[in-house]
Amino acid sequence: MSTKRQKRERKQAALAKENERSTLISFISFFIIAFLFFLWGSWLLPITDPVESNYALTAREMVESGDWMSPQIYGVYWYDKPIMVYWFLSLAYSALGFTDLASRLPSALAGALSVALLIWYLRRILKDNVVSIWAGVMLATSLECWVISHAIITDSLLLLFTIPTMLSAYIGITENSKKHLVIAYAGAGLACLTKGPVGLVLPGLLLVLWCLSMKSPKTILRLFPWQGLLAFFVIVLPWYGGMYAIHGSDFINEFLGLHNVLRATSSEHPEDNHWYYYLILLPASLLPWAFVSFYEMKMRWKEKGAFYLFLMVWCWGTILFYTLMATKYVTYSYIAVVPAITFAAFGALRIRMGEKLPSILGGLGLLLLMAALFAGTFRLKEGNWLVFYAVLAYGLFAYLIRWKANQYKRLTIISAVTASAFLCCISEGLPHFMICLLYTSPSPRD
């Protein structure tokens, strides 16, 4: 009996080891594919004013001055954002020089890592390869993820650190795993070094709301392990404490007061201050997967399991949080894309099984995205759009005309056509569009 048990245990250990190896290979493979996808054409995109140039110029001065602690622009200390994005940009500049490619490398890297991490976490939580892989594919081909993974802003890095913050917290709470809760707090610490206090405050609020929705007191108690709090402070205190020691109240007043509290209480862009702002933005951000995502949210409403509630609180709690903030900005709700895309990945199972309505909704999302890009080609006449038109024609033919024949290829068609269209845009129209922005936007000095 003992011998049989030992054989069974050895077999289970071998299977577990093989599964870990397979997971690692998948992680690396999807990271490389996503990284090349996001990196393609980045060298064609000039740095635009004023937002991108502020980050790029600050990082350049960091390299040239040798002061990697205090961000500054034109010799003036700059407290707009924490240090993380400047460190990544400075490392890229140190390795590749002050080029457009180096400027966009950190966002491409963060976007690819986000895709790979989402696949890893969903495989870990759901034990479902199909859902996890399609979640990664859908995230990479969603409109906002593709755009932000090419932009010189903080949001790509914020998403990268928010994924382990939220998903490790879910694992830590549901499985009572101290290790994953420490990872979650470490992710929150890195997010605070990227975007500021919101990197901890928003995930914390979302997790507390989710724990309350579970109606289980022990989940709340598990949320605050001392080891996690220690990990958080070990990560954030060196820079925040160092900045206060060097700059004193100027840092506190400008960083926390002007760039955090004031933006939350006083609108920086009054023309965008509408309650429905993010309700319009989220579906557009998710294209071509928006309708599949919302359909799956509705279909799973009656289940209301732990992971469903977690994703709903994450998605709509983020939208509510930023709706209540005075300043509205197109990238603020970016982290809501991850739970919404996860719902779309659940919907992928229905499309793969040939269900009619999810397949129609997937095609509708593709049609809207292609229509928007098609309209853009008439505004940007400098590019050669023949390849894009061929991609569009193939998409219409494969998805609509050969509807029944391609029943089990619909997901592949949507993702392939979307990815191809994005690559056409970055090779032809987007560089011309950004050059126009460069000459019509105000200088960061203004």
Model regions: which residues?
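Intrinsically disordered, low-complexity coil/linker segments enriched for acidic/polar
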Residues: 2-3, 406
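Membrane-integral, polyisoprenol-dependent glycosyltransferases
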Residues: 3-7, 15-357
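Alpha-helical and His/Cys-centered functional microenvironments
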Residues: 10, 16, 436
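Short, cationic motifs built from Arg/Lys/His that form the positively charged side of catalytic pockets
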Residues: 104, 445-446
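Membrane-embedded architecture of ER/inner-membrane glycosylation machinery
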Residues: 182, 299-441, 445
